[in-house]
Swiss-Prot record:
Keywords: Aminoacyl-tRNA synthetase, ATP-binding, Cytoplasm, Ligase, Nucleotide-binding, Protein biosynthesis. This is Glutamate--tRNA ligase. It comes from Aster yellows witches'-broom phytoplasma (strain AYWB). It catalyses: tRNA(Glu) + L-glutamate + ATP = L-glutamyl-tRNA(Glu) + AMP + diphosphate. Disulfide bonds: none annotated. The gene is gltX. Its EC number is 6.1.1.17. GO terms for molecular function: ATP binding; glutamate-tRNA ligase activity; tRNA binding; zinc ion binding. The lineage of its organism: Bacteria, Bacillati, Mycoplasmatota, Mollicutes, Acholeplasmatales. CDD domains: GluRS_core. A motif ('HIGH' region) lies at residues 10-20.
């Protein structure tokens, strides 16, 4: 059996896009599942679209996702160069072979010596291939005009260069978007003309936005680039997980899967024909689940490293405080940058009450006495979680307050919020000074009613 070898061949037009990342991932999963090779090739012959630093950005984003490769522009290999702009002589050689055989011809621009080279499409021929996802697809040659293989500037067209490169680099399988289906008959013509073995194609489903239209870079309500997710604190393994499920239904009891589990489960037979929906709610859920698998210490270190709390007054140099803080909110985080929102929500220096909290104070006359009781208790105790917990328990046991009213009054009085995480640890992290300040403020508001 021929060794499996796949490639991801981006243009260096900027950051790694969601759709391109999915393409890279499917090729990578297929290669790794079958103990094959995954390589990178850069298609950079359209200089008008190339972006400075675009290639480096693509490679950096791929590595962040956890994708590695055995050949590429950065590490080279036996079939290089791996940039199309460095392979022009190769394309010219094969174009000349077609000219010599009368299978291509020069098309001169009017009144100039400048010319393009067009491939002479054979008449009355059928071009078919067995798509690994869609089954047999067939095209007729009369549907296709003679097409340019070398442009007038000397650079190859996409459909010519990609065949030369894939053949010389011994690519066995090609996973790509369904928009490439119409390119395939032109590419088959080149394979057949040179009597080269045809690779196996798999054209992946479209990715749709929440309006069930093809995902576009113009979709302002969906972040389009991997780097954006990295900056917000999405985990690479979570994004790897999410993107792998866009058009793939693994035979698994859970959708929360590690990269290695996805490699083990990858099966071309379970790739979908129907379009895949880019569901940001599902992405947040998956990232939350992957975050829960990490220790608070790991997330705390990440927060400090990425400086997610630099715009707050959080004591980021206090590792113990940061770890406890993360443990409070870890299960609530969809992405790590949300930690700053949680901090601002609870650790505001100027207390204020929501309308919902104000209504509670108005409709529960016991609140004033409860707040006074807790103020007096908290004023004299050591402000550590266990001590705070026992103090709250003692107040609850020694007084005839309604438990529901007592605990809601406690939460509003100490945090100015109706809802939140474990109260004892939260109060320890807030500190006695801030807690008493909040209690004093809320008590004054309650006494107005």
């Amino acid at each position: 059996m021929k060794k499996i070898k796949v490639r991801y061949a981006p243009s260096p037009t900027g950051f790694l896009h969601i759709g391109n990342a999915r393409t890279a991932l499917f090729n990578y999963l297929f290669a790794k599942h079958n103990q094959g090779e995954f390589i990178i090739r850069i298609e950079d012959t359209d200089f008008s679209r190339n972006v400075k630093g675009g290639e480096a950005s693509q490679l950096k984003n791929l590595r962040w996702l956890g994708i590695d490769w055995s050949e590429g522009p950065d590490i080279q290999g036996p079939f290089g160069p791996y940039r199309q702009s460095e392979r022009l002589a190769i394309y010219q050689k094969y174009a000349q072979k077609l000219l010599d055989q009368g299978l291509a011809y020069k098309e001169f621009q009017e009144n100039t010596t400048t010319f393009a080279i067009r491939f002479r499409v054979p008449t009355n021929q059928t071009f078919s291939f067995d798509d690994l996802i869609r089954g047999k697809l067939t095209f007729q040659s009369q549907e296709i005009e003679d097409w340019v293989i070398i442009k007038s500037n000397g650079y190859p067209s996409y459909n010519f260069a990609v065949v030369i490169d894939d053949h010389l680099m011994q690519i066995s399988h090609i996973f790509r978007g369904e928009e490439h289906i119409t390119n395939t008959p032109k590419q088959i013509m080149i394979y057949q003309t040179f009597q080269w073995h045809l690779p196996q194609f798999a054209h992946m489903t479209l990715i749709l936005n929440d309006n069930k239209k093809k995902l576009s870079k113009r979709d302002a309500n969906i972040m389009q680039f991997i780097e954006q997710y990295e900056k917000l604190g999405y985990l690479p393994q979570a994004l790897f997980n999410f993107l792998s499920l866009l058009g793939f239904s693994p035979l698994s009891q859970t959708e929360i899967l590690s990269p290695q589990e996805l490699i083990n489960l990858f099966d071309v037979a379970r790739l979908n024909k129907a379009p895949a929906m880019f569901d940001t709610v599902k992405l947040d859920y998956l990232n939350n689940q992957h975050l829960r698998k990490l220790t608070p210490e790991v997330i705390a270190s990440f927060i400090v490293q990425k400086k997610y709390l630099t715009l707050t007054t959080a004591p980021t140099n206090d590792k113990e405080w940061m770890t406890k803080f993360v443990s409070l909110f870890q299960d609530r985080m969809n992405y790590i940058q949300q930690i700053a929102d949680f901090y601002q929500l609870f650790f505001q220096t100027k207390p204020s009450l929501s309308q919902e909290a104000t209504i509670f104070l108005q409709t529960n006359p016991q609140t004033t006495l409860i707040l006074k009781t807790f103020y007096n208790v908290f004023d004299v105790i050591v402000f550590k979680k266990d001590v705070i917990f026992n103090a709250i328990k003692q107040v609850a046991n020694q007084n005839d307050f309604s438990k529901k009213t007592l605990f809601m009054a406690l939460r509003i009085g100490t945090t100015c919020k109706m809802h939140g995480p474990s109260i004892a640890l939260l109060l320890e992290l807030l500190g006695k000074k801030q807690v008493l300040k909040n209690l004093s403020y809320v008590l004054k508001q309650a006494q107005k009613f």
